[in-house]
Each structure stands twice: as structure tokens, then as C-alpha cells.
Amino acid sequence: MFGKLLTKIFGSRNDRTLKTLGKIVTKINALEADFEKFSDEELKAKTAEFKQRLESGQTLDDVMPEAFAVVREASKRVFEMRHFDVQLLGGMVLDSNRIAEMRTGEGKTLTATLPAYLNALTGKGVHVITVNDYLARRDAENNRPLFEFLGMTVGVNIAGMGQAEKKMAYASDITYGTNNEFGFDYLRDNMAFSPNERVQRPLHYALIDEVDSILIDEARTPLIISGAAEDSSELYIKINTLIPHLIRQDKEDTEEEIGDGDYSIDEKAKQVHMTERGQEKVEVLLTERGMLAEGDSLYSAANISLLHHVNAALRAHTLFEKDVDYIVQDNEVIIVDEHTGRTMPGRRWSEGLHQAVEAKEGVHIQNENQTLASITFQNFFRQYEKLAGMTGTADTEAFEFQHIYGLDTVVIPTNRPMVRKDHADLVYLTAEEKYDAIIKDIIDCRDRGQPVLVGTVSIEQSELLHSMLKKAKIPHEVLNAKFHEREAEIVAQAGRSGAVTIATNMAGRGTDIVLGGNWNMEIDALENPTAEQKAKIKADWQVRHDEVVAAGGLHILGTERHESRRIDNQLRGRSGRQGDAGSSRFYLSMEDSLMRIFASERVSSMMKKLGMEKGEAIEHPWVSRAIENAQRKVEARNFDIRKQLLEFDDVANDQRQVVYAQRNELMDAESIQDTIVNIQADVVNGLIDQYIPPQSVEELWDIAGLETRLEQEYALRMPVQEWLDKEDDLHEETLRERIVEIWVKAYKAKEEMVGAQVLRQFEKAVMLQTLDGLWKEHLAAMDHLRQGIHLRGYAQKNPKQEYKRESFELFQQMLESLKHDVISILSKVQVQAQSDVEEMEERRRQEEAKVRRDYQHAEAEALVGAEEAQALAATQPVVREGEKVGRNDPCPCGSGRKYKQCHGKLS
């Protein structure tokens, strides 16, 4: 209450921000009359003047009012469009590392031209990031005339472009592209072998369109570049035949009784768990098929791979539904984005899940992949010096934007007042009653000439409605993952009188629905249209527009509430653009997944007690509140998963930054001879210390072991024992000096034989290739570590701390291996001439050609149990089974080493 009183007196934080920025808008407006008098040449010359002022020490804030006024004037001349004051506000918010929430139809694309131009003046490049290739190309082509008028270059960065094209795109002042492509290019640049293979400049300013979709919905999806691993398609096919034999458990296990069934499903967590009975049944089935030895357990260390395949197949059959989570097209399983309803060709689920789904559907099973490089969008975008974004719906996620990215959200007022009517939800008992009511509403709107946009949450729903409308003989268009080739055309005409459009998750479609239809697209369809033709098309459109407004504008009809309130708001936001008339209503049933999983049974029983007859609906604020609370629960849980994924990825990110920085340093260096000399000294001394411990007596020296290692790993034959037998004055230090001296001489001889330049090139190639190979193995080790780390909670340990500690140990081991492997290769390999180095490079290129890009879904299942396990760590007492192992006793693992030098190290 006190907070509300303060807000009344001082205004909200948002109001205060807008008030401050409003003063700058007044300054920009004051400049308009002066700039209108400028000739085109004088206006264009302002770009060079701004650049000069920045070089002489002024800041972007100093030139911003004039720069925005210049862009507004140029837009009036090039597009015949003037930036509204609210668009100037949006531009300022985007320039100040914040997120601008601008309603649909308020001109986000035009708003983006202001900060894009301003930040391009620095010469460091601006990346305007959209959700798909179509929007990137469209926005680049639409805005190119304006930017080129002002002397700026524009590039487009989309999938399938060659290296030279990408370099040119990144060298442009303003580069449009998709989030995937910018992320992949970053990873590819960090896998390059020479500086001229890199395409990106340092990451300066990113302006993200549909920022909530990219920074929140896709935050659980790391970008992964991977290479094919071994073929295990036969195994997936065999395991797939087991699943139909398993039965789902009807009720959960309790302390009193064990539920019947082989597996249980946790729909909230999207997890499936095998019961003890299920495990026994799977073991019997595997034994019958000769895949498991008689009496062997599925959970033994040797059968971990089998268990992994069984779990993947079980998830594929129980949690992933055709035409909801994926579609089958051209003998291929293609993922459907749950947030936008778009298909995502080229993306694959990780951890063998995609192959399991392919086996389930009987299509060609593609090989599993090995990760070569990966990064989450969260960590990629946090590398930009400046980051900003715009969307129609950000306020519900404002906390996450601030907490994860440090970005404040500012809600920009609409240019004209919003007049859309948002009706209360109608809740029915069954889905059948709900769909009947939806069809009646559609018919009613169509009879009045009101266009209807029906939003569904899955392809399955859209196809059900499609068949019902077909049966009712109602003409309509369907827009879903199966038919998005005609997307722009369908959306453009969705505002015509009586039009009925079914759309799966309308979010991110990128084309505004104009009441009466899109007259611009009609003009674009004509070749060289005359002024008369344009005038006629516009006049006809005006008549249609007025008819639709009189009928009530665009009516939004939601068939189900989405897990996220934001997606519902995006659907609603398609209506009522720029002060247009419009309305919206959601139809729900107690059989909807959100209601079934999260809304309490009390709602359902209350509806039954009310004695509701078939076809009756309940419309009550209490029910709407219950639904909103259910959505809040899901949003909070999803936020926790994203936050947890980020906490784990931050550990990997620190290591990634070190490796990539070191890699770029090596690649840019003319010669890495000094680095090789230092590594060589470390390796030699480490090796000698291992076999001749410092300040130790001769009896502890393992000379035979030292001679063997020197010969096997470093191709150096040294009769160390012979020297010691013959030379009495040879002690530890003089022996060390002699070994180092011979080693250095052998390497010098190699250099004299092939030439210093060839050896320097070879050193660099070996160093980079060895680093890449070890980094690849390290990523796989980190994946395995992360997948099982939550189990540490059951051993009273904090999974996050354990992950940090063990991943650091793995990283240290990788760096040690790098030193030894590089020196071993350089010592053993005989380089004959330049052709050997070139052959090595050619082999690398051939390997690289086999590498495919994968945009894999890592839904963080491995982390879901971490918090639960962590809680257990705090509450469960320590119970030791068996005798305590002494520090000097042999390790129980059977390695032959002392416990303190083996597994005792970790305890």
C-alpha cells in the first residue's frame, strides 16, 4: 500500500524514465524545422560530420539528438514516413542498453533505424538480429535505401553464405541476420586455423528484434557445432522394439504400496522414470534379444550405454508427440518450436533423443554427433559491448532480463490509445464443448464480416479445427509449421472482411495484420504499377478497411492458454494495432494440458457441482486468476531451469573464454617458438621429476622407466643408466642438464634439416590441432559430468560446487595433456618439407568438411534434479556402508594404487 502511495506521488520508474527521455524528444523536434531546409547533399554530409565529432572526443549521447533528427528527416524523404515521438523514445531506450516494449504495429522496424544509425557512426559495426532468414532479408532490403542515403553500408548474414560473402556482410556498417547465424559464426571463427578464415569483427552492438523469443524462449537451447560420431542406428532400432512391451503406471508409488506399471510420467517436469518392475522387464527383454548377458544388470557400469538408449527410446515414445513436438517430412524428423509453431530444419535434440524419435517413426536414423564447440545464447549475447532489444511483450519477463542480462525494460506508450476489448476467458468441461463454441463464434463473426484469427498451441489442434471448419463449409486459411511457405501472403490478407485464419502460435510471425488486407502487397504484386493503379488499390482498400472497423476489427480467438502469459499477450497483440478496433477471447476446457496439470481439481469439481449442462461455460474472475497463477508457476519453474543452465554454463564459459583467447593469440602470432620452448622446458622437467624425484637418493630413481618414456613418447634414445654406471660425478642436476641439452640439440637438428620457417608453421599447426582435439574431448567430458552431477546431492554434496571443482580439475588435466601431446608430436614426427605441412592442412580441411552444424535442444534434464538432490544433501545423515578405507590402504577400485593417491583424492 505504501509503495502504491509513493508511485502515485512520484510516478513509476517507467514514468520517470519516459519523462527524462521526453525532454530529449523535445530537442529533436526543435531541430526538425532546420533539417527540413537542408538539401539532400547537406543532410548526407551530416554522417561524416558526426564521425569527425566522435573521433575528436564527443560521445554518442552528445550527437544523439541531431543524429535522430537526421534519420527522421531522411526517412521522410526516402520512405515518406516520419518517426512518431514514441518511436524516438523507443530509439533512445534501445541506445541505452535497455529493452523497449512496443506494442504490435507501433513500427519497431522503423524505430530500430535510429539506434542502428547512431551506433554505426562508431565504425565498429551494428548487428540487427531477427528470428528468421525471411525477416532478416526483408528488414535489410526495406531499410537499405534509408541507410545508403545516409552513407551507411548494409549487409545480410544468413545460412548458406560463403566465407567471402560473410566477411563482406560483417564489414558493413549495419548487418542484419538471425541469432543462430551470428552465434554459429562466433563458434566457427574460434575453430579457424588462420586469421583470414575469421569473418566476425569484435562484438560491439546487438539490437535484437523479438528479444523475448531469443533471450528467453531459446535460452535453454545451446548452439552446437558437431561432427558425426560412430554409427549406432541398429541399436536404436532394436531398443525401439522393447518400448511397446512396457506399461505406464496408473498411480504413483507410496510407502504403503508399489504402483502397477513399468514406468511413470511426471508431466510437470516432462520426465519419465522407469520403475523397478520396468527395469526387470527391460533386462529380460534385452537378455532374450542377446543384448545383455544372463544375470547382468542394466545399471552396471558396462551397460550405461544401453541404459542411455532405453531412456531415450522411452522418452521418445511417451513425452514426444508427432504433429505437436515434431513433424515427419521427406523421411526426416523435424522439430517444431513450441513457442512459435515454426519448423526448425537442421536442429536436432541431443543425447540420442532425436535418433530415438527417428527409430520410433521408422525413418532414416542419422548418426549421433560429437560436440566440437558450443555456447548458449545467454553467454553469446553477454559478450557484446552494448545489448538492446525490442518486443511487444517484455514486461512479464522484466525480472529475468534484469537478473540474467542486466537489461532494464521500458514500456513505450502507444502512438494512439488502445481500444481493443479483451473479453474474459470461457471455461468448458470438455474439449468437445469448447471446440463447438469456437466454431459458433467463428460463424457469428463471419456473418458480421469480422475477420477472425484463431490461435492454437499445436499443429494437431490447428488440423482438428481445419477439419471442423471444412465440415461446416467455412472458407479459411491454415498457418502452421507444415505450410509456412505462404506465411506472409496468408498473414497479409488475414484482416479482410470475413477472413478466417488458423495460426499455430502467432508469435514472431513478423508481418502485421492490416484491417481490410495489406494494400502494399497488392501494389508489390504488380509490375511497374502506375499512379492510377496505386490510387485505385488504396481507395478499394479504404472501403474494405471501413467495413472491417464497423464489424468490430480483428477478433482474436485463443483455443488454449499457453504455458507463458507472454505468448498469450503476443497473440492478443495482433489485434488493435495503432488504435484500430479489435477484440479477443480465450476458450478453455478442463481437458487442456495447462488446466489438467496445474489448475487444481477443485475448479473441475466446482464446475460439476454447479450442475453445468453440456455446452455451458463458466466465466468468472476467480477462474481467470487460477489460470494466471498456474501460468506464473510454469514461468517460475522455466526461469529456474534457465538460471540453473546458465550457472552451469558459466563454468564452461570461463574455460571457453580462456581457450578461445589463447587460440586467437596463437593464430595471430607470427611465430610460437617461445611458447614451444617454454612448454618443452615444463615437459622435460616434469618428466625427470617423475622418475628422478628432486633431492632424492639414487635408490628411488626409476632410470629404466625414464629411458622407456623418452624413447616411446619423445623418440629420444638416451643411455641414462650407462652414463650413471660410467660417470661417478653425475648427479641429479648434471643429469637433468645433459638430458635437456641432448633434447634441445635433437630439435635444433630437425630445424636445420627442414628450415626454420617450415618448422614454425608446423609448430603452429600442431599446437592448434592438438588444442582443438583436446577441447573436443574436454567438452564431451564436461557433458558427461553435467549429466550425472545432480546425483552428488544424495551424497550430501552441493552439485554446483562439485561441478565447479571437477570441471576445473578436468581443465587442468586438459592443459597438461596439451603440453605433453604437442612436445611428443613435435619430437616424433619427421617433417621433410613444406609439402608435409600443406598435407596436414589439407587433411584438416577434409575433416572440417565432414563437420555439420547442429542446433541442438539441451533441455537441461541433467540439471532438473539438482535442486532436489541439493536439498537432500542438507537433510540426509551420512551412512557408511562397509568398512572405512585407510588413506594408505589399496584403493577398492582395483587400480593397485594407494587410496589417498586414487579415489581418496576426491573425498
UniProtKB/Swiss-Prot annotation:
It catalyses: ATP + H2O + cellular proteinSide 1 = ADP + phosphate + cellular proteinSide 2. The keyword Cell cycle does not apply. GO terms for cellular component: cell envelope Sec protein transport complex; cytosol; plasma membrane. Its EC number is 7.4.2.8. GO terms for biological process: intracellular protein transmembrane transport; protein import; protein targeting; protein transport by the Sec complex. Keywords: ATP-binding, Cell inner membrane, Cell membrane, Cytoplasm, Membrane, Metal-binding, Nucleotide-binding, Protein transport, Translocase, Translocation, Transport, Zinc. ATP binds at residues 87, 105-109, 512. Belongs to the SecA family. Monomer and homodimer. Part of the essential Sec protein translocation apparatus which comprises SecA, SecYEG and auxiliary proteins SecDF-YajC and YidC. This is Protein translocase subunit SecA. The lineage of its organism: Bacteria, Pseudomonadati, Pseudomonadota, Gammaproteobacteria, Alteromonadales.
